[in-house]
């Protein structure tokens, strides 16, 4: 029986659950994880068919019309780097519809339904999940605490606890929608006393 196949096998997934499940124990030491992110600004420019000269501030779009570097960067910050809508012709309506669909897929399929499938009840409220995501997206680069988020949400009528908020933030991180940044210059107990920051995976979600 042949046991050495000259082939590569690729498994793709939209969240961290695949490698945190029982499957990872069978693949231990036998796989390479490659995390795919939305387009960087330079990749976004390439996708749009625009090429700026080194240090140049103006280029020509595929249709021949001039494009300013600053306008291109502002467009990237506004619409983000999702390949499906990386185009100079993308409208605000198209962007909103697409990003809303992507978020719903992440929130419902990758988070809520997965939690239910695992028999857990930590993340069950899509509305609360959206509120937590909106809070984090609106406070990019700012320190936060689960207590602070829980207090803010409770004061607006969405009663919750810091433990629930922690579960929801963790679920958003597992779905690769947010990435946590902690202090690199602190160690030991001092690190435990600081609050982290969250950064969203794509500015288009904001």
Predicted regions and their residues:
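Conserved catalytic/switch belt of AAA+ P-loop NTPases
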Residues: 1-11, 24-25
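Residues immediately C-terminal
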Residues: 3, 18, 205-206
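A structure-centric signal for secondary-structure junctions around beta-strands
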Residues: 6, 70-73, 194-195
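Short glycine- and Lys/Arg-enriched binding-loop motifs that mark or flank ligand-binding interfaces
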Residues: 9, 25, 76-77, 198-200
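Structural signal for conserved beta-strand scaffold positions within catalytic alpha/beta enzyme cores
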Residues: 11, 33-35, 180, 200
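Interdomain motor-coupling "hinge/lid" segment immediately C-terminal to the ATP-binding subdomain
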Residues: 14-16, 21-142
């Amino acid at each position: 029986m042949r046991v050495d196949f000259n082939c590569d096998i690729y498994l793709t997934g939209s969240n961290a659950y695949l490698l945190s499940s029982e499957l990872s124990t069978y693949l231990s030491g036998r796989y390479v994880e490659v995390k795919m992110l939305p387009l960087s600004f330079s990749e976004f420019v390439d996708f749009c068919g625009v090429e700026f000269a080194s240090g140049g501030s103006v280029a020509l779009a595929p249709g021949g019309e001039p494009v300013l570097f600053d306008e291109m960067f502002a467009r990237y910050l506004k619409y983000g780097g999702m390949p499906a809508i990386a185009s100079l012709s993308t409208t605000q309506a198209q962007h909103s519809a697409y990003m809303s669909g992507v978020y719903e897929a992440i929130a419902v399929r990758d988070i809520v339904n997965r939690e239910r499938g695992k028999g857990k009840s930590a993340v069950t409220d899509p509305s609360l999940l959206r509120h937590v995501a909106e809070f984090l997206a609106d406070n990019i680069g700012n320190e936060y605490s689960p207590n602070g988020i829980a207090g803010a949400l409770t004061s607006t009528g969405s009663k919750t606890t810091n433990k629930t908020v922690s579960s929801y933030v963790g679920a958003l991180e597992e779905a690769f929608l947010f990435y946590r940044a902690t202090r690199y210059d602190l160690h030991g107990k001092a690190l435990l006393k600081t609050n982290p920051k969250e950064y969203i995976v794509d500015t288009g979600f904001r």
